[in-house]
Regions:
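Helix-start (N-cap) detector for alpha-helical repeat units in TPR-like alpha-solenoids
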Residues: 33, 39-41, 74-75, 108-109, ...
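Position-specific recognition of the canonical hydrophobic site in helix A of tetratricopeptide repeat
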Residues: 44, 51, 78, 85, ...
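Canonical tetratricopeptide repeat
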Residues: 45, 79, 113, 158, ...
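Residue-level recognition of tetratricopeptide repeat
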Residues: 48, 82, 116-117, 168, ...
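Structural signature of tandem alpha-helical TPR/SEL1-like repeats
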Residues: 52-65, 86-99, 122-134, 175-198, ...
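TPR/TPR-like (Sel1-like) alpha-helical repeat modules
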Residues: 132-141, 245, 249-276, 284-287, ...
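Terminal, low-structured helical/coil segments at or just beyond the last alpha-helical repeat
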Residues: 268-351
Length: 351
């Protein structure tokens, strides 16, 4: 069936090209342009087939041939950019995405991909932020026909993703600043928190959004908000160990060993068997907190320890990977629900 369809498409393009060549005698310039367009679309079709077969080199050759003839084909530019990313040719990928945007200004996928590789791979955070802002500011035609078509949700989701990626870009820019640029770092982290907050307004139960909001407030020294969002992240996806671990570290710093032990124990269980180095470090931290707790035999009120919007003077180790354990049977549901409980949540609630 696939071969028959491919043959029909080839015949269609050949017949159409012959017809357009014939028409070129009436309007030569227009006719030549249309011939190039049709032949370009044919090469793009060949590229699409190769792309689906995962034959990337043939796809690249076909797309390049097609785009020489029909450079306005924005989807071909997008696919070509994606292939360059797979080959880790990020500069060529960026150029392909830029060409896609030239062909279609409000092409959200191309802008999003361009922003991601510009920030994550090329280190141009300002350019990435500009792309995300363009997505946020874009005025797209929204249409909702029940049970037929609805692009309102996708447009809303894209804005949430753009805000989230913008937050990451601000955070990364802050991370790469020299240590003596404390004021600038704080300002950038503040901008990251605003961007993550905008994403959270759209998508409240996303683990990554809540976790990065928590982490940003943690770095800013706003422990109350950090605790609130760590708990939200844990409730959204309890089997990721990072939120448990970072919350445990923060509670240790706030002299709340009982709650710190609870979170660090969960982090240790979730990281065991997957990240041996991380697991050992978590167990070491857990052991030290447990020992301190046993020696003191008490924990002080956290409400006297939390300071809002004051940077933390002590550097704290942070693990930033996407490890998780997934429950697979009914017996583990209870375990998941136990991990979902953020025992220190009430400590961060505003009176």
């Amino acid at each position: 069936m696939g071969k028959l369809l491919s043959l029909i498409m080839k015949i269609f393009f050949i017949v159409l090209a012959i017809f357009l060549i014939y028409c070129a005698t009436i309007g030569r310039e227009f006719g030549i342009k249309q011939v190039h367009k049709i032949m370009g679309m044919y090469y793009v079709h060949v590229g699409d087939e190769a792309y689906q077969r995962n034959d990337m080199q043939e796809a690249v050759d076909a797309y390049q041939n097609g785009l020489k003839l029909f450079p306005e084909h924005y989807e071909a530019w997008l696919n070509l950019g994606n292939i360059y990313v797979a080959y880790e040719d990020y500069y060529s990928a960026a150029q392909a995405y830029q060409n896609a945007i030239l062909a279609k200004e409000n092409y959200t996928l191309a802008r999003m991909n361009l922003g991601i590789i510009t920030a994550e791979k090329l280190g141009d955070f300002d350019a990435a932020i500009a792309e995300y802002q363009s997505i946020i500011d874009s005025k797209q035609f929204l249409l909702s026909i029940p049970f037929v078509f609805d692009n309102k949700k996708s447009a809303k989701d894209n804005k949430a993703i753009a805000y989230y990626n913008m937050g990451r870009a601000y955070s990364q820019k802050a991370f790469y600043l020299p240590q003596n640029k404390k004021k600038e770092k704080k300002e950038l982290l503040g901008q990251a928190a605003v961007a993550y907050g905008k994403a959270h307004e759209i998508t409240k139960n996303d683990y990554d959004i809540n976790y990065n909001l928590a982490l940003t407030y943690h770095l800013l020294g706003d422990y109350r908000k950090a605790g609130q969002y760590y708990c939200k992240a844990i409730e959204a996806s309890p089997m990721h160990y990072e939120a448990h671990y970072n919350l445990g570290l923060m509670l240790k710093h706030l002299n709340q060993p009982k709650y710190a032990i609870d979170e660090l124990e969960k982090a240790a269980v979730l990281s065991s068997g997957k990240y041996s180095t991380h697991s050992k470090y978590i167990f070491d931290v857990l052991s030290s907190v447990t020992l301190e707790f046993q020696q003191k035999g008490e924990d002080k009120s956290i409400r006297d320890k939390i300071k809002i919007n004051e940077p933390d003077t002590q550097e704290q180790p942070l693990i930033l990977v996407n490890g998780k354990v997934t429950a697979t049977d009914e017996a583990e549901v209870a375990i998941v629900e136990n991990f979902r409980k953020c025992m220190s949540k009430e400590l961060f609630e505003v009176n």
